[in-house]
């Protein structure tokens, strides 16, 4: 994978797979099997790979409806806090509800210089 000058957001590091990778890298650093610089490079590759994989492979659509509580736009990132949300997949099935949902929306690639 060519990383070039592009950088990707680190959003997916907080997903279950991202946390598992981070924990594993921490263990390898603690055991002195890799250095921290290599771990950071691996995480950078993960950021790019997960972004591109989701962009390419996810085809399902989701609709949601709720009450917008708060929104903000900072550093090219939108954040929405929504209450009483109902989710419906385009494949049918049962609707899912949640009391509160936080949605973070940004470009797949970070703008240059951030």
UniProtKB/Swiss-Prot annotation:
Entry keyword set: Nucleus, Transcription, Transcription regulation
Subcellular location: Nucleus
GO CC terms of this entry: transcription factor TFIIA complex
A matching Pfam family: TFIIA_gamma_N
Chain segments annotated as coiled-coil in the UniProt record: none
Main location as per UniProt: nucleus
Domain of life according to the entry: Eukaryota
Record-level Gene Ontology MF annotations: RNA polymerase II core promoter sequence-specific DNA binding; TBP-class protein binding
GO biological process, one term: positive regulation of transcription initiation by RNA polymerase II
Classification via CDD domains: TFIIA_gamma_C (cd10014), TFIIA_gamma_N (cd10145)
UniProt family annotation: Belongs to the TFIIA subunit 2 family.
Subunit field text: TFIIA is a heterodimer composed of the large toa1 and the small toa2 subunits.
Stated role: TFIIA is a component of the transcription machinery of RNA polymerase II and plays an important role in transcriptional activation. TFIIA in a complex with tbp mediates transcriptional activity.
Protein name: Transcription initiation factor IIA subunit 2
Gene name linked to the record: toa2
């Amino acid at each position: 994978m060519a990383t070039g000058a592009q950088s990707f957001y680190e959003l997916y590091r907080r997903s279950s797979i991202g946390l598992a990778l981070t924990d594993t890298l921490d263990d390898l650093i603690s055991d002195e099997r890799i250095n921290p610089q290599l771990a950071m490079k691996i995480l950078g590759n993960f950021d790019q790979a997960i972004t591109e994989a989701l962009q390419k492979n996810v085809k399902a659509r989701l609709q949601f409806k709720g009450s917008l509580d708060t929104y903000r736009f900072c550093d090219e990132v939108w954040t929405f806090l929504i209450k009483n949300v109902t989710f419906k997949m385009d494949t049918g099935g049962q609707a899912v509800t949640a009391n509160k949902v936080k949605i973070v929306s940004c470009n797949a690639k970070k703008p240059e210089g951030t």
